[in-house]
Amino acid sequence: MNYEEAVAYIEDIPRFTTKNSLDHTRECLKRLGDPQRKFRVIHVAGTNGKGSTCAFITSVLREAGYSCGLFTSPHLVEINERFQINEEVIDDDTFLRAFEKVKKLSDELVAEGSYHPTYFETLLLMGMVIFAEAGVDYVTLETGLGGIRGSGDRSWRTSGCNHCGGGSGSLCDHIHQPGSYAVSWEYGFRDRRREGRDHGAGCSGDLRWK
């Protein structure tokens, strides 16, 4: 496939796939060699401002001298916009190489009578391949559905996985990982701290209130 054909294939995925479980995402990552374990992930969730927050975090890390990947959605013009390395959108060749690896895996899974990765899973898997091959130190990842429903959750190296959310309601949606840090802040009239503590009681991570 060339670049245009690859994009057309991805855009057509929702027509022939259904939502998969998180176990499916983990299995795909494993069969790709667990590329997500080659860097640290900052997983950003919340109602509004996720993309801006991801960009801010990436800029700060770049100023500190780190190599960074950025994964956001949706794209505005071209699908490549979802993937940035050191604040630069990836080129078509990089996109196509990652697609070919994920497409090969997808074909193998279908041939085995298993599942085909969803639209978002396909892009997420491509992103992990792209960032691993680029050798980045950090990846700032904007959540998709988020929480227990999102394929971008619970697949990361927990020793370096930080989560930022607009209030601990994000934590209560099961985004926070055992062994990781969670950064949150209060807003509105609900007792977000109490909610965060209730959820965090079952986790081994630290809750830092700002």
Q: Where would I find each of the regions flagged by the language model?
A:
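ATP-dependent carboxylate-amine ligase catalytic core
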Residues: 29-30, 34-37, 63-165, 182
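Short functional linear segments
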Residues: 1-46, 53-66, 71, 107-114
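N-terminal-biased segments
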Residues: 1-20, 86-87, 141-146, 155-156, ...
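Conserved catalytic-core segment of NTP-binding enzymes
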Residues: 155-210
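Residue-level signal for inorganic ion chemistry
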Residues: 10, 47, 68, 140, ...
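Structural motif
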Residues: 40, 69, 138-139, 169-171, ...
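Conserved active-site and cofactor/substrate-binding residues in soluble primary-metabolism enzymes
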Residues: 1, 20-23, 52, 90-93, ...
